[in-house]
Amino acid sequence: MKIKLMKYYFSIISVLILTSCSTISGIGDAVGSINPFDRSDEKSKAAQGKVAGDTDRISILELNETLKESENIKPEQIVLPPAYSNVSWPQVGGNAAHALQHTDAKGSFRKLWSKSTGKGSNRKGRVVAPPVTDGGYIYTMDGNNLITAMDVISGNKLWKYKVALTERQRTRKGRVGVIERVRDPLSLLDGSGTDKESVGGGIAVENGKLFVTSGLGVVSGLDSKTGEEIWRTVTRTPMHSAPTSAGGRVFAVSDDNELFAFNAETGEVIWTYQGIVESARMLTAPSPAVVGDTVISGFASGELIALRVQNGSVLWQDALSSAGQLTPLASLNDIASGPVVDDGYVIASAQSGVTSAFDLRTGQRIWTQPAGSLNFPLLAGDFVYLAMTDGRIICMSKTDGSVIWIKQLRSHKNIKKKKKRISYSGPIFVGERLMVMSSRGKAITLNPYDGTIIDEFKIGGNVFIAPVIANETVFVMTNSAKLIAFR
């Protein structure tokens, strides 16, 4: 009987305590302010900040730190190094350091020729690899792993090479016939073994060899004049980045963030470094940067790591990530282009909204700006130019990151409704002009001293890849795999 009474009294006391908790001043408000989904309290709404309605859109920049033009450096203080005519553009970013500086081109541009190089972007593959040129030939990679060599003057096709694998070398699942299994019993160990799609990879040319990486999980070395395969190495992992060739080695990053160093003569794997695995990444063709005995690579995780080219030992590492509130884009920290190295500075951009400069030797962070990009920063002397993900082109000081000018290009086809976003690739220098390409099929040139638009003209196709320049000729690869030459 006593036990039953005790249970009864305990129940009454518990109910009274819970009831009183809901009436204690401040507790209800505190709980409401913690809950980010509560819309019933005005104080809670104020704490959450601006909330998007059915017709409202909140800029990501409202949720993060914004860029501001510096009062210390004025556009008239910009001094560029002398322009020069570069003979070649042998790898992604122009050279192994991704820093070709102030490349030259004179006068207004006219189309020289336009050639189809294969299949454009489709559900099985994407055109992500920029063209490269050794000065005589220009090389392309289409959306179906077809490599084409053309004459830079006429655009005439000289040879083709299709990246393909034997059944046992496949990296993705599909159908393999009984006959193939009988011919190669070891293929039973490889699953069903057919690649249905291939995204990623790129090309680089050096010392008479064209190096090819692909989403099929194969790296090849070709004779750059004939297209003959000299060597191939199967990585079993799809390759994401374009190759970087320097000092007898070829560097590339796989889909699972593994950095490979290959022997440029034989294709033998010298060493590998495994970064943090990150499944989400942008559809671009980044590449590691190499200067002297140091290779610097960015990864989809936002990691930026410097290693010794000889053995892959880590010299220093850092990470680029958005410091603002979490947004869908800010959660993707992919360094989607690659680092740029010049004069002891390493500069890299993550698409999540960060651009930072580091000391090449120590890895110490020098400055950071809230500027996200899918493109390589463009260095010229003491200044950095960047095409941001929101359509802004900016000029910054290389030494301290001060923003000198900001130019907002058209961000959407329908500005009022914020529909059909426009992206920009580049920039590159064409003499005393910056040039960017629009995903809506336009080339735009800007004044590098203040960002004003000088000219714009139609290209003849949508473009998502940065243009390249050699011998004062600009080459543009469209999303439909058409290569267009302007001079």
Language-model regions, residue ranges each:
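C-terminal motif of bacterial Sec signal peptides marking the signal peptidase cleavage site
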Residues: 17-20
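Bacterial signal peptide processing site
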Residues: 22-25
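Blade/loop signatures of beta-propeller domains
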Residues: 49-69, 75-112, 314
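Short coil/turn segments that connect the beta-strands within blades of beta-propeller domains
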Residues: 86-87, 135-136, 207-208, 247-248, ...
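Extracytoplasmic beta-rich repeat domains
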Residues: 112-132, 160-204, 229-246, 269-291, ...
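WD40 beta-propeller blade core
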Residues: 148, 220, 260, 305, ...
